[in-house]
């Protein structure tokens, strides 16, 4: 499996943008789902408290998105799914892999006592599912467009249609023509 630096860099950019979209829309989904959970706050308070927790959390979240995007850009073309489905599938795969760790947050996270209960909460699960689906969709579409190959050349109109409007005989195909038996 060869790895292209340019493909990897464009994937990282797509992942960083997708993570930023995720983080920017969190206030809206907190209102929709009724769960005051902020991923950037979770990441930031794992490292520090106070005024720098949220900006640091945004940086960590964006960096994580870039790493995920770089990996995605190199793996996704080999996944046997339609290109439009690869990003959402990757986002949901990450969700399924990481959601069980929310059961450990109250005990292991430095700010665990201050975090809302996520494990066992249907609205929190729905909120996290939405976020991962959004992330995967933005990542997949942006990476696909950034790393798209050259567009196939479309033949000119004159090349496929003759002056009589029916095409060229040279381009006609004959199916089922049987040669007479010479015997």
Model-based region annotation:
Residues 1-183:
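Short amphipathic, positively biased membrane-proximal segments
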């Amino acid at each position: 499996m060869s790895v292209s630096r340019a493909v990897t860099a464009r994937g990282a950019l797509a992942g960083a943008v997708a993570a930023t979209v995720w983080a920017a829309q969190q206030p809206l989904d907190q209102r929709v789902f009724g769960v005051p959970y902020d991923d950037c706050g979770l990441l930031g308070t794992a490292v520090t408290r106070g005024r720098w927790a949220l900006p640091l959390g945004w940086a960590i979240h964006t960096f994580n998105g870039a790493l995920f995007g770089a990996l995605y850009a190199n793996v996704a073309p080999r996944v046997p799914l339609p290109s439009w489905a690869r990003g959402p599938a990757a986002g949901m795969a990450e969700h399924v892999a990481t959601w069980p760790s929310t059961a450990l947050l109250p005990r292991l996270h430095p700010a665990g006592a201050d975090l809302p209960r996520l494990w066992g909460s249907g609205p929190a699960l729905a909120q996290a599912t939405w976020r991962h689906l959004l992330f995967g969709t933005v990542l997949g579409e942006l990476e696909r467009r950034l790393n798209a190959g050259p567009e196939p050349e479309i033949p000119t109109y004159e090349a496929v249609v003759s002056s009589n409007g029916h095409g060229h005989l040279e381009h006609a195909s004959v199916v089922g023509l049987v040669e007479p038996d010479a015997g």
